């Protein structure tokens, strides 16, 4: 992996700003955001990154990768898994925690909530159960009713996003 000098400078600036702004909380464990356990993990470099994608639940639609503003999600090929008669999953998302800014666009866009595995407006990181069993084939076989108005709104939003992606 080749890192350009500008990217390295930008990363260093963000890193140093973060340390400076959070120094008291990191060292003394003060404030409500950093517990003693988290402080020790930060200082020793042993912070565990939580599992963000439930691979068994994912349908491999690539929506999360397409919507990610930092391109932190890469679709990794897997052995094909038949989900329905007409659909086979052949890749799953892998999130790069160094690029991810936890904007949760992927979570909001995922049709089965396999990214961060939470259906809620609160930040899902480290919240709730680690694993929920769901039969994906039943989810995809259920008929979805969408009004004409909703279809028009969705197609309008998609066309705006496609234009933005093409410009990038």
From Swiss-Prot:
GO terms of molecular function: 4 iron, 4 sulfur cluster binding; metal ion binding; oxidoreductase activity
Domain 4Fe-4S ferredoxin-type: residue ranges: 48-78, 91-122
tRNA-binding in keyword set: no
Keywords: 4Fe-4S, Electron transport, Iron, Iron-sulfur, Metal-binding, Repeat, Transport
Sites where the protein binds [4Fe-4S] cluster: 58, 61, 64, 68, 100, 103, 106, 110
UniProt cross-references to InterPro entries, sorted A to Z: 4Fe4S_Fe-S-bd, 4Fe4S_Fe_S_CS, Fe-S_Ferredoxin
SUPFAM superfamilies hit by this protein: 4Fe-4S ferredoxins
Keyword Ribosomal protein: no
Gene3D superfamilies referenced in this protein's UniProt entry, alphabetically: 3.30.70.3270
Protein name listed in UniProt: Uncharacterized polyferredoxin-like protein MJ1302
């Amino acid at each position: 992996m080749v890192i350009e000098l500008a990217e390295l400078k930008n990363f260093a600036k963000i890193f140093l700003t973060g340390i400076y702004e959070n120094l008291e909380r990191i060292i003394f464990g003060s404030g409500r955001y950093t517990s003693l356990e988290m402080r020790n993990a930060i200082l020793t470099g042993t912070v565990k990154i939580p599992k963000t994608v439930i691979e068994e639940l994912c349908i491999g639609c690539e929506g999360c990768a397409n919507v990610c503003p930092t391109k932190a999600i890469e679709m990794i090929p897997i052995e094909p898994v038949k989900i329905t008669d007409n659909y086979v999953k052949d890749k799953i998302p892998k999130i790069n925690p160094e690029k991810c800014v936890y904007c949760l666009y992927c979570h909001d866009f995922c049709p089965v909530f396999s990214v961060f595995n939470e259906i809620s407006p609160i930040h899902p990181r480290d919240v709730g159960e680690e694993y929920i069993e769901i039969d994906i084939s039943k989810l995809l076989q259920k008929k979805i009713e969408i009004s004409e108005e909703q279809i028009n709104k969705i197609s309008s939003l998609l066309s705006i996003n496609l234009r933005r992606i093409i410009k990038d």
